[in-house]
Amino acid sequence: MSSPKVGFVSLGCPKALVDSERILTQLRTEGYEVTPEYNDADVVVVNTCGFIDSAKAESLEAIGEAIAENGKVIVTGCMGVEESVIRQVHPSVLAVTGPQQYEEVVRAVHGVAPPRQDHNPYLDLVPPQGVKLTPRHYAYLKISEGCNHRCSFCIIPSMRGDLVSRPVGDVLSEAERLVRAGVKELLVISQDTSAYGVDIKYRSGFWNGRPVKTRMTELCAALSELGVWTRLHYVYPYPHVDEVIGLMADGKVLPYLDIPFQHASPRILRAMKRPAFEDKTLARIKRWREECPDLTLRSTFIVGFPGETEEDFQYLLDWMSEAQLDRVGCFQYSPVEGAPANTLDNPVPDEVKQERWERFMEHQQAISTARLSTRVGREIDVLIDSVDEEGAVGRSSADAPEIDGCVYVDSEQPLKAGDMVRVRVTDSDEYDLWGERIA
């Protein structure tokens, strides 16, 4: 008897990717095969994104494609909280579940394609690190779920609930398994990484027989013992974030902080229900760079938020000139169903949003170009992501996968994905570096 086969489509952010990995790990444990072909699958699972309208549209399109190609489709993920919308567009879906409802997804798969009764999990073991959808040399490490903030443009708490921190011992044990499996970079993710442990009052857990506090700084210190790159994402700028800068300066954690500032105008930040301390933030950035000169700062911003005036937008551009951030993403404000910001007065016209977005990107591009040019002539460590006939492509400590730039490496010796090499930088542009391998 052949094993049932599952097709899987994973959309959205790295946190959703980790959810997909968890579901697939359970299905593989039960003997299911995972297939990349729609027509070879007994059932297709689509893990959706529902954060903004464009993501919902992409999710609905992916569901429709899976139905057209296969016909047996189970929907899960963030858009699953809007089951009526999904069924209105695609009434033939077999089941709809929300985010984090892993067991419900597996039960739905059982209902369509039951697992083999003669499957012995002890003879067909899943790798200890579980099924991973990333390349072997890096992995996302989710440390918590949900968020306690109530930003006016966001509906994540209504989809994923309040903050729930994973036990620190479980997180560190998972990290150990990943490193043993060959992972060389751990990307720490959550909805709010710097709030890790606040829901359980930073209670201590145990790892390798010793207590470790459920707190970002202590977690990072423990992860540093594993001897691989540790990169921090989605870090809300609480005061205790200052503590990890010392770990970065000492080489224990990558000197990289992903902090979603969203805007700089105090008036817009208040409307967003975000901290409106942009002047203090500039002072902190200055202190961080004094303590850790190699620090890379990444952030995301929203332009065209309801009520944003030309004065607010110019304030943001001036702030960007002061902050000199290294890596920046920018989005035009898009209404999200259920978000409080939808009720705010003075929406910004689409053509103004587009014009401001273009000006913002041009402004930041000049900053990025100048900052990257200072790295020419320096020697940096590069983790190789891919190799083809044109050469090797990798990332430095300043580059997260898929969202930042990359380093194009010229090497006389053959390279492969996962290699860590020393590179002398020879050229740069707005986002990327070029260099020669020296070791």
From Swiss-Prot:
**Gene encoding it?**
rimO
Tell me the InterPro entries matching this sequence.
Elp3/MiaA/NifB-like_rSAM, Methylthiotransferase, Methylthiotransferase_CS, Methylthiotransferase_N, Methylthiotransferase_N_sf, NA-bd_OB-fold, Ribosomal_uS12_MeSTrfase_RimO, rSAM
UniProt source species: Bordetella pertussis (strain Tohama I / ATCC BAA-589 / NCTC 13251)
The Enzyme Commission number assigned here is 2.8.4.4
Q: Which family does it belong to?
A: Belongs to the methylthiotransferase family. RimO subfamily.
Q: Taxonomy-wise, where does this protein's organism fall, top ranks first?
A: Bacteria, Pseudomonadati, Pseudomonadota, Betaproteobacteria, Burkholderiales
> What protein is this chain from?
Ribosomal protein uS12 methylthiotransferase RimO
Residues binding [4Fe-4S] cluster 2 are C147, C151, C154
Q: Which SMART domains match?
A: Elp3 (SM00729)
Alphabetically list the UniProt keywords.
4Fe-4S, Cytoplasm, Iron, Iron-sulfur, Metal-binding, S-adenosyl-L-methionine, Transferase
Q: Which reaction does it catalyse?
A: L-aspartate(89)-[ribosomal protein uS12]-hydrogen + (sulfur carrier)-SH + AH2 + 2 S-adenosyl-L-methionine = 3-methylsulfanyl-L-aspartate(89)-[ribosomal protein uS12]-hydrogen + (sulfur carrier)-H + 5'-deoxyadenosine + L-methionine + A + S-adenosyl-L-homocysteine + 2 H(+)
